[in-house]
């Protein structure tokens, strides 16, 4: 019994450490063109918001508008280089396909519904950088809410 409890404790600790590590990662850092987009916008990794900061909405209150815009330009660069965006326009179908591939979400999954809602919410924005950051922030916030609701279930 003690061994079983120890295994559960270790599993919980690893899960917590993994979630903490993910929230400390920088938005977009998992993508191939991350370094290229940072260079194109004369930014360093220190200039980019963390996933935790964006998913909680803290990026909006802790940073100046210029920092928000610059982070958005890096996100737009990543989306454009992956063929998900051209200028300020999304390729919604490709965005859904890539999201499903990346997350393993299945049709009817609430995460896909959240992505659709986030794309709809931001589709009429004209500034490509602000639009990109708002889209990413919307999706990350929705994923955090869904993860919290699934933990409580």
Curated annotation (Swiss-Prot):
Keywords: Behavior, Disulfide bond, Pheromone response, Pheromone-binding, Secreted, Signal, Transport
Compartment list: Secreted
Any one Gene Ontology cellular component term annotated for this protein: extracellular space
Leader sequence residues: 1-19
Pfam families hit by this protein: PBP_GOBP (PF01395)
Single annotated GO MF: pheromone binding
Family: Belongs to the PBP/GOBP family.
Subunit details: Homodimer.
Role played: Colony queen number, a major feature of social organization, is associated with worker genotype for Gp-9. Colonies are headed by either a single reproductive queen (monogyne form) or multiple queens (polygyne form). Differences in worker Gp-9 genotypes between social forms may cause differences in workers' abilities to recognize queens and regulate their numbers.
Protein name as it appears in the record: Pheromone-binding protein Gp-9
């Amino acid at each position: 019994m003690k061994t079983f409890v120890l295994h559960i404790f270790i599993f919980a600790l690893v899960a917590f450490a993994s979630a903490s590590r993910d929230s400390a990662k920088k938005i977009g850092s998992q993508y191939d063109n991350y370094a290229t987009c940072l260079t194109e916008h004369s930014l360093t990794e220190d200039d980019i918001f963390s996933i935790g900061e964006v998913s909680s909405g803290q990026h909006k209150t802790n940073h100046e508008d210029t920092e928000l815009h610059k982070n958005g330009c890096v996100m737009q660069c990543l989306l454009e280089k992956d063929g998900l965006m051209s200028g300020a326009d999304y390729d919604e179908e490709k965005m859904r396909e890539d999201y499903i591939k990346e997350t393993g979400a299945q049709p009817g999954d609430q995460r896909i519904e959240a992505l659709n809602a986030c794309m709809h919410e931001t589709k009429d924005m004209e500034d490509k950088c602000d639009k990109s950051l708002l889209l990413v922030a919307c999706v990350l916030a929705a994923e955090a809410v869904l993860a919290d609701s699934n933990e409580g279930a």
